Amino acid sequence: MKRQSVSEIREIFLNYFKDKAHAVVPSSSLLPAGDPTLLFTTAGMVQFKPLFTGAVELPYTRATSCQKCLRTTDLEVVGKTERHCTFFEMLGNFSFGDYFKEEAIDYALDCSVNHLGFDKEKIWVTVYTDDDEAEKIWITKGIPKERIMRLGKKDNFWGPAGDSGACGPCSELYLDRGVEKGGPDCATSGTCRPGCDCDRFLEFWNIVFNQFNQDTEGNLHPLKQTGIDTGSGLERVALLLQGADSVYDTNELRKIISFYEELSGIKYDDVITLSKMPTQKNNTARIAANQKAAFRVVTDHIRSVLFSIGDGIYPDRTGRGYVIRRLIRRATLFGRKLNFKEPFLYKLVDKVVEIYKPRYPELGKNSAAIQKTILAEEELFLKTLELGLEKIETLVAKTKTSGKTIFSGADAFLLYGTYGFPAEMTEEIVAEQGLDFDKKGFQEELEKDRQFSRESWKANKVSLMTGQSVEKTEFLGYSSLSGKGNIIHLFNENKPAGALKEGQAGAIVLNKTPFYPEGGGQVGDTGFLRQGKNVFKVLDTQKENDVILHFGEVLSGEFSIAQELEAEVEAARRERLRFHHSGTHLLNGALRNLLGDHVLQKGSVVSPEYLRFDFSHPSALTSKEIRKIESWVNESIRKNYPVVTKELPIEDAKKIGAVATFGEKYGDRVRVVQMGDASVEFCGGTHVSHTGEIGYFFIKKESSPGAGNRRIEGVCGPAVIETFQNRFAELTESVQNLNLKIKSELDNEGSKILVNSNVPGPDEIREKLEKEGATAVTFFRDLSEEIASQIEESTSAFLKMKKSLESRDFENNASVIEKVFASSMDTGVGKIVSAIFDDKDPNSLKGLSDNLKVREKNLLVILGSKNADNASVVITCSSQLVSKGIHCGDLVRTVCEMLGGKGGGKPDMAQGGGKEKQNLESAISFAIQLAKQTLTGEKV
């Protein structure tokens, strides 16, 4: 293969398609224009979505581009693998009603082999399961059938980008890199093919045959014109053509690494060499492996951050900005492995800009602003990072000293609550120290803290301001999550205090604050109040007589009246509150629109984890109604309505149709929140700026809190992802446990009732939701219900089959039969046998009695069983004994009367039962005596 630079590969590709009459279209921004369903531009076709659907007039019918893209779905593995990046460039060629499959396949193969220089003999191809046409075309182009694989929808059906748009089956080109790149089992198994998880086959070109338009409900409609959408990752193509070990060893990324080498004094090649040594009991190799990952992470993240800020996406506490902030903080943390203790990312801006400025000149114009922004973010994070890292080192050492291998959830929560360490960051750090992370324990601690803040601090708010001079608190939180304020009141143990010291719990009142106090259903904010080393952790925020009280505890230092504090709200938590509060408004709008104006709000809880909404409605919602409501809310999210807030005289607010909360008291002026045509409500809470920020909405549960009212519990945004991840994790466990039980207890006989559902994993769930939005919500709802139904059906079939097998084993069990005969009574006319068992149904007793009668001609069988809630009895006899006067039906009726139940039957077979199972022994004994009297004439 030809060894070309990244810029040469880019130009070869674009010029090839330019010669094929394609318009060369510049890359669009990483900020998707007019598409609220996407956080970032994630593929080359994003800017062409309207052209595929025919929504706009075509300026051209074929195009080519090299598109800037940003994806964070695989963030945790970036730096650890040889091919994952968050930022990358996507080469692509596109047809809008022009050419289709044959030309697209021909272009892909011709460009790959004859212009880029790929070895045709090493190219493998995948096609969609039933795409015979594509396979036939590939064969005619010289790709043998044995190098063409058919894969399903997960691998070979693409799109849309977002929750609606063009989509269709696809065909991918893979390069066989040799058996040495395969996994441990691939070399010996001989089954390694495209689609295998190893690195032997690397996909480098994807051709999507756009034939459908998917609406927001997930329905597919034929496109008026078919289209072609191809994607070829530039960095990945460079990896293959340059024979590099990873994308980070390609020429452009390797140049960025060289800048870090200069700053750190550490040589990347030395790190790579040392990292290949066995890491077991080799500290040098482990350090090198960590440094290798660090070089790669900071190299990747600087590109993502630089290009994002260059396109106007600045670090923030929410949405896209939060992703960029997280990338900067992650890079800062990894930079410590390269001995960077001070801000360093900003120093690379000018040098990285020089690499990409020829292709993206806008970077040069914005480099100063980019540099300044990154420096400010690094300085902000480094303020708390040092203390947090010292603490985590202590906690890791404590864990290891105690002989444990799991880093406790309680310790992780301490880092989260005190130092602001995200759980995923702690997990990465402790993993490097060889410790597992107790996710469940962390979640439990998180929940306990929430419960504590909801209950403990609520009790303290009662009448704290009674007798105090009241100064109304100025609320800053609509526009900011941080700000300065002076202490005007302090409370300790429900009493006014002059100071609060380390370890003490209490409440602080500031003259102004960004902390939102509980109200309108929205729970109070949490966060920190700081002055230097004086730190007060806010666990809850409440309001009394227009005064906002911050309840919590002093973590360090001391607080006194008149101190000026820096107040900082927990941003990620507030973001989720905004999602759920705005989602609640849309839900209220959906209910009133779909169910009627009789719907009145009866109660509401807006928490970071979920929303709960009580409303007046006479009957339970049907499954169809729930889906309609969910769809209505998601459609309002998709429309990305601006969220407008304004203060109005209450009468003016009523005139514009603002909905008030039933039973709530309002002043002369009210705050109104409007979301397009979807919702207008009185509300003092915090909200998103556009409904599209919410992402998606899912109804978890519908129930009744009381007569005449209904309750909906739902989730928005990231909580939807977590809900489905938890739901499918539970389903996975249920499927595995059930299948294991079926296999172990039924052997081969249970193979037909095994649950064969393909349960999606957490990464797949996140990626699909982030990519497809509301469509994925419906998909996962349907899939989870389908799998749950399969589990229920298989469980029922398992119990039935197990019971049948147990019954069969019981009926034919020789030892049981011998035991029953061992206690037989010979009357001289015929034998009477009886027995009492536990938990046997009448059919099992009947089967056993039939087998007993086979052994003896003149036989009366009386069998009983004590079950969980009752007793059952079966009496049968041979025809010879019927002729002697035995009537099984009469005997059963007698027994059942003593059991407090009913029964009956024919002379030779009868059955019955009753709830008074404690009488079973005496009842059967009495039946034996009656039968003996009938057969022998002896009186009972």
Swiss-Prot record:
Please give the superkingdom of this protein's source.
Bacteria
For activity, the cofactor(s) needed are: Zn(2+)
Q: Where in the cell is it found?
A: Cytoplasm
| One Gene Ontology cellular component | cytosol
**What's the catalysed reaction?**
tRNA(Ala) + L-alanine + ATP = L-alanyl-tRNA(Ala) + AMP + diphosphate
What are the UniProt keywords, alphabetically?
Answer: Aminoacyl-tRNA synthetase, ATP-binding, Cytoplasm, Ligase, Metal-binding, Nucleotide-binding, Protein biosynthesis, RNA-binding, tRNA-binding, Zinc
* The EC number(s) this enzyme carries: 6.1.1.7
Query: One GO molecular function term?
Result: aminoacyl-tRNA deacylase activity
The record's remark on the cofactor is:
Binds 1 zinc ion per subunit.
Question: A biological process (GO) annotation for this entry?
Answer: alanyl-tRNA aminoacylation
Q: Name the PROSITE patterns for this protein.
A: AA_TRNA_LIGASE_II_ALA (PS50860)
SUPFAM superfamilies for this protein: Class II aaRS and biotin synthetases, Putative anticodon-binding domain of alanyl-tRNA synthetase (AlaRS), ThrRS/AlaRS common domain, Translation proteins
Q: Which Pfam families match?
A: DHHA1 (PF02272), tRNA-synt_2c (PF01411), tRNA_SAD (PF07973)
Principal EC category: ligase
Q: Which Gene3D superfamilies match?
A: 2.40.30.130, 3.10.310.40, 3.30.54.20, Bira Bifunctional Protein, Domain 2 (3.30.930.10), Threonyl-trna Synthetase, Chain A, domain 2 (3.30.980.10)
Broad class of the protein's primary localization: cytoplasm
Q: Which PANTHER family match?
A: ALANINE--TRNA LIGASE, CYTOPLASMIC, ALANYL-TRNA SYNTHETASE
What the record says about family reads: Belongs to the class-II aminoacyl-tRNA synthetase family.
- The record's note on its domains: Consists of three domains; the N-terminal catalytic domain, the editing domain and the C-terminal C-Ala domain. The editing domain removes incorrectly charged amino acids, while the C-Ala domain, along with tRNA(Ala), serves as a bridge to cooperatively bring together the editing and aminoacylation centers thus stimulating deacylation of misacylated tRNAs.
Under which name does UniProt file this protein? Alanine--tRNA ligase
Q: Name the source organism.
A: Leptospira borgpetersenii serovar Hardjo-bovis (strain L550)
Q: What gene name is listed for this protein?
A: alaS
